Amino acid sequence: DKVLWSTPIAKANAITELKRRDYNPMPLKRVNIRKSNGKLRPLGIPTMKDRAMQALYLMALDPVAETTADNHSYGFRKERCTGDAIHQCYINLSKESSPQWILEGDIKGCFDHINHEWLLNNIPMDKVMLRKWLKSGFIFNKQLFPTEEGTPQGGIISPTLANMALDGLQTMLEAKFHRVDLYSPKRSYYPKVHLIRYADDFIITSISKEMLEQEIMPMVKEFLQARGLTLSEEKTKITHIDEGFDFLGFNIRKYKGKFLITSSKESQKKFQRKINEIVNSHKTIPQESLI
């Protein structure tokens, strides 16, 4: 709508407009950005007013989301980052007795395909407002398109909605693989099944490839199906720790029993490309200034 709140006065005046009554969000502006693999990622950009309204409701929703979140969910959460997720990988996989098999999970178009009815039935917030945001549509090439599924990447509240849709997977796995010590019933343990998730990227560990294929994978697929989601066949695979796997820009493996965490080859290539861009765009400046 070409409206900017660029001054303190404009922002102060805008506060008085943030009312639920007669509020109707504008369609999102669709912009495609290119990912590192060459594919395009659609972003939905809301107006300033819609962004502010989402932020207002997020202030109430976020504390609720934190109380129901999986313990080992690290994406789009305060005081958590990729480093915490990688540290949890070290805790779960570094010991000699640690699980050896890993399911590398990637959800296909997570933000674009979350089922609207599931969100409306399960997200504890104003249903009228949530429905308006989910059904606001988007404009691309000057044409208006409806939104029948998904929550747009670019919306302030979208990461929290996606996280809440995926929360519960860890609890489900723990309930399934919970074991009670026969000799000491008060003690319990889990047979090396651990979930570590960052947004829509996750890994699940296990003692065997068969357990991942025959028990865990069907559970994950059923969990996602209820939310309108599926696993990416291209990116989801089962790997032995000795072969190593890439997760959040790092490569994690064991070599001759030693646990190693290094930057992934793709991360190294991305870093090299960035350096090349900087050098090529500053060819005329002195060497000491470039460094």
Residues covered by each model-derived region:
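Amphipathic alpha-helical blocks
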Residues: 2-27
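Conserved polymerase palm-domain catalytic core
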Residues: 17-21, 27, 31, 71-72, ...
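Short helix/loop capping segments that flank catalytic or ligand/cofactor-binding pockets
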Residues: 43, 53-54, 112-115, 174, ...
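Active/ligand-binding-proximal structured segments within catalytic/core domains
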Residues: 53-61, 161-162
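Charged boundary/loop elements
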Residues: 59-72
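Active-site beta-loop-alpha junctions of metal-dependent nucleic acid enzymes
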Residues: 78-82
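A conserved non-catalytic segment of reverse transcriptases
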Residues: 227-291
